[in-house]
Amino acid sequence: MIKMVIVVRSDIKMGKGKIAAQVAHAAVTLVVSIINSNNLRWKEWLNEWLHQGQPKIIVKVNSLDEIISRAKKAETMNLPFSIIEDAGKTQLEPGTITCLGIGPAPENLVDSITGDLKLL
């Protein structure tokens, strides 16, 4: 199975609507970045993901450090990832990192980075 996982920071105060918007930003950013990339493997994964119902799992971490360390792991593994920074127009300071999106990619690869995390 191909899936996308969005990792949300739980150490910053965000309303439900803000969290939903940040998760949506991560998902859209990942898809657009893959479409605009030259990585054929990522494009294959995206196509499979689109035909599998676009599975998305939302999990949480307790710190910015956890977001950064997991992003570095995704980069090392050459997986699509996106770090989302808030624009600062409503609840948060500009540039606050709110979440990390990983995938779409094979479940076993994504799970090696996020499989230990609790669902949001």
From Swiss-Prot:
- Reactions catalysed, as given in the entry: an N-acyl-L-alpha-aminoacyl-tRNA + H2O = an N-acyl-L-amino acid + a tRNA + H(+)
Q: Which Pfam family is one of this chain's hits?
A: PTH2
**EC number(s) per entry:** 3.1.1.29
Q: Any idea where this protein resides?
A: Cytoplasm
Major place of residence: cytoplasm
Sample GO molecular function, one term: peptidyl-tRNA hydrolase activity
The protein's superkingdom reads: Archaea
Annotated GO biological processes are:
translation
GO cellular component terms, semicolon-separated: cytosol
List the keywords (alphabetical): Cytoplasm, Hydrolase
> What family is this protein classified in?
Belongs to the PTH2 family.
Q: How does it assemble?
A: Homodimer.
**Purpose:** The natural substrate for this enzyme may be peptidyl-tRNAs which drop off the ribosome during protein synthesis.
Name of this protein:
Peptidyl-tRNA hydrolase
